[in-house]
Amino acid sequence: LADLAAADLVLWLPADDGRFIAAAHCRPATSTTVHVDDIIGLHLPAAREIDLRRALHSGEVVRSPAARWAGTYSMMETCVPVCHEGRIIAVVTREANLSSPRLSLGFEGWTVAAADTLCQMMARGEYPYDSTPQVTSHGVPRVLDGALLLDAEGRVQHATPNAVSCLRRLGIRTHVTGKVLAQEITEVIGDGTLIEESMAVVVMGRASWRVEIAARASTVSMRALPLVNGRKRLGAVILTRDVSEVHRHEQELMTKD
């Protein structure tokens, strides 16, 4: 979420003394961090508590009306209530450094819109997901590794250059924008390839699972981030990562053993 939003995420818990204390912090890999120093365990300045209390009591996402000057940079802050089992238990601040240019990764702003949707889902208790993929030795795909945006029907709306490169490794040479990702992948896999049962669910963006797809001596790991509003499917973000070299290294070690 931090990478999609190109912003720091700070989890604030209401303390017994009525103030907020920082319990967790995640820096973005797609922009410059707002907090250079470690802030875990620190209290929120009283001047910033108004928006957090609004989010905590209203259960709605609260955006600052204007940028705030923070020393040597300006910052735009969004307060996102964290809903769990129908109760607001914390607030996440999404803090974007406006003085630093975002990394040019071919995103064209759609990742920020996807982050907005995930924040709305967090306020409704729909994100983080109930089930998340386990971290393997290959790691979990990140936004920097490659990202695609699918609509509710599984059609590709946007793709970062790294995601396009991952698809090319699998043998998908044509432009995928406007096409159903699942169909494009099925065509290049081949009949003799073992297909994981979860593949269709992931590449259609219907569950927050992870799957590895192998074709043409290449292996690409994919993870789905479904975008929903209640029972309505809005689409999904698919994160991709080329793990071919890792697989080849593992095969070499097995051969030596």
Describe the predicted segments one by one.
Residues A55-V62, Q120-T132, V188-G192, V203-R206, ...:
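Short, positively charged
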Residues P14-A15, R19-A47, G106-A115, Y127-P128, ...:
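PAS-family sensory domains
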Residues S64-H84, A90, E184-E245:
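PAS-family sensory/regulatory modules and their coupling/dimerization elements
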Residues L1-A5, D51, A114, S131-V135:
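Amphipathic alpha-helical coiled-coil segments that mediate homodimerization
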Residues V92-D130, P226-D257:
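Sensory coupling linkers of modular signal transduction proteins
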Residues A2-V61, A66-Y73, C83-R87:
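Non-catalytic regulatory/interaction regions at protein termini and inter-domain linkers
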Residues D8, T78-C79, G146:
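Conserved beta-strand and immediately adjacent loop positions that scaffold enzyme active sites
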Residues A24-R27, T93, P161, A224, ...:
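Short clusters of small/polar residues that mark proteolytic maturation junctions
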